[in-house]
Amino acid sequence: MPAPRARVVLLAGPSGSGKSYVARRSGLPILSLDDFYKDTGDPTLPRLDGAVDWDSPAAWDAAAAVRVICELSADGTADVPVYDISRDRHVGHRTVSVLSGTVFIAEGIFAAEIVAGCSTRGVLADALCLRRWPVVTFVRRLLRDLREGRKPPAVLIRRGLRLWRTERAVVRRQCALGARPGSRRQVERRLRELAAAGQESRSA
């Protein structure tokens, strides 16, 4: 198997922990794993209390995410779906490109689910889990979701309280799947190290 042109950093963490913010600050190319949610109406979607459980990994297409990551790693470019969370469906596609010899970030709440798949295929640079105090995550998530109009306010509050109660278990699961836990500063430092290593590789 030829060496990949680029490798992926999987950035996991609870919803609202700041993954997208940290990824943007890194300056590295970003693949949003939220774009691999399944469309509403998919018969395989999991349900909780009579509604779709969007916080279950079964609501997400892990195979498609790994396929696109491998394509980006091998070819430097990939056609990526665009998902509208407020409408629970895909609304288009976009092209993502990365430079040869670099790393790129794939971030999302289910990133840890594909650590093994990416590692087996030789495209994994690192897997990190961003963790914060649950109360901070709760406030960040609620303000973001209300601002973006992702769901009706009552739904967001109920979901937020449920995720608050389960956040520590979510982090434990992500770490058990192979993601290394760290604070925002620790994760940002590791991303800088990986970015610098990529620059050295390109200039060598």
Residue map of PLM features:
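Hydrophobic positions on the alpha1 helix immediately C-terminal to the Walker A/P-loop
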Residues: 22
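ATP-dependent NMP and nucleoside kinases share a basic, alpha-helical "lid"
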Residues: 92-150
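Pre-Walker A (Motif I) flank of P-loop NTPase domains
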Residues: 4-8
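Conserved lysine of the Walker
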Residues: 19
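NTP-dependent small-molecule kinase module
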Residues: 2-3, 99-100, 162-204
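The conserved Walker
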Residues: 15
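Hydrophobic anchor at the beta1->P-loop junction of P-loop NTPases
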Residues: 11
